[in-house]
Amino acid sequence: MCIRDSSRTDGPTSIILSRQNLDSFVVKELDQLKMGGYFVSKKNDATVNLIATGSEVGLALEAEKLLTTDGINCNVVSVPCLETLLSNKNRYNEIFSSKTTNIVIECGHPNSWYKHTQNVIGIDCFGESGKGKDLMDHFGFTPEKITNKIKQMI
């Protein structure tokens, strides 16, 4: 997908990487990547969609485990490209369903998500320096802190 998108001629492309060690997961159906968003974990009885991008997907999966132990069933959605997702209305409507509480986890500025849901956990200030793990804790991006914020939203 990165190679395909980097060869676009109709607009800019950025590939954003992390310096942190991240858990990886396998995308079973590569065609789902082309839709801009896909379910990493899907339950028939989910009441919450945890929507994340990039490194936040692993955090969403950890929060899902904690919420499940509290009886809150969640789907986890990866959105590698919001622009592509917006062009796939059926997939967009499946992800941002009115049947679930949709919560976005975004370690960057949350503004681009507010037109899709008011439930956004993001960072609206910058300029901190330090180790990645310490900064994630400082900004509230640990599985436990994210889980507590999600519980307050639902």
Q: What residue ranges belong to the model's regions?
A:
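Short, small-residue-biased leader/transition segments that mark boundaries at the very start
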Residues: M1-I3
